């Protein structure tokens, strides 16, 4: 069945969201139109404002409406000479939720992927190199995803940091707390054995 052009456009627009197929998009559109137009207007306003006003921090590249994000602008960060390199702004939120890191971040907004046309320029590595060359960074902590692309990106950045004589470390990978060994994949288990620590 064909809907009106505006309803079709709404359904198609909702499909741009990750994990939203035609049926889910249709359900969302109908929910907003049938039962919650007020929320639909609020969503439209928030989306419009965010798309217009949210940009990237000039220092770390995470999302912000200001020139500097709250983390980079804060004078209360205890270890401002530490930079944790992550792939996405969501990674920053995950690390911040843990409350164990008080340094700064650098958000790549992706990972190296030559087949997809993503190289060092697309990841803002010239800005990261500027930070490294400033002499204000004592350690770079690489927290890219444990994938082939994430590992390649980490090695590329590690080589870059070593040229500036900056210490480089990578977050540990292994068995999750509370996890059972029988459910852990062999690669993760191998990383756990290789990264074991003395007690």
Curated annotation (Swiss-Prot):
It holds the Pfam family RecR_HhH. Residues 81-176 form the Toprim domain. One of its GO terms (molecular function) is DNA binding. NCBIfam families: recR. Belongs to the RecR family. Keywords: DNA damage, DNA recombination, DNA repair, Metal-binding, Zinc, Zinc-finger. PROSITE patterns: TOPRIM (PS50880). May play a role in DNA repair. It seems to be involved in an RecBC-independent recombinational process of DNA repair. It may act with RecF and RecO. Gene3D superfamilies: 3.40.1360.10, 6.10.250.240, RecR Domain 1 (1.10.8.420). Coiled coil: none annotated. The gene is recR. GO terms for biological process: DNA recombination; DNA repair. The keyword Lipid metabolism does not apply. The lineage of its organism: Bacteria, Pseudomonadati, Pseudomonadota, Gammaproteobacteria, Alteromonadales. This is Recombination protein RecR. A zinc finger (C4-type) spans 57-72. It comes from the Bacteria.
